[in-house]
């Protein structure tokens, strides 16, 4: 199949349109009061989730005609940001999706108005550095505070029992331990602590 190449405003508009499709689906899961999303599957029944990265991964944009060509690129940019956040922190994927979309949208407006894209990039990098410093000042160190860990885990999981279990496990493994969550086969929550295992 012959490749189609798009330039300038047309290319940016197509990328932004694809990013917006993914953004609109994921943004509803934002925060502890975010709504659930039902995901249809080609096999089995639908699944219900409150997790932004799960919603993002489930979206596959079909570039069926000339109108939708390039949309997939925009959606993949947002997915890439959400996946990276998930790999680094295991949470915050919806926030990253919302921020990434709005940065793309505003950058598109500025570029269309004649601003230099490379200078915009440098400005974003400087702003990100300052934001990270400020967030560091605002952050609370909750290491060793079982009650606060349980609160954060409860909000993240949306379930008090899971939050308490995570706090119990964190207390056992300490600040340098690694927590891995897997879907169980039974009906009860359970934990297992393995001492002395390390990945090098």
Model region roles, listed by residue range:
Residues 1-194:
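N-terminal glycine-/lysine-enriched basic segments
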Residues 198-200:
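Conserved small/polar residues in nucleotide/adenosyl-binding loops
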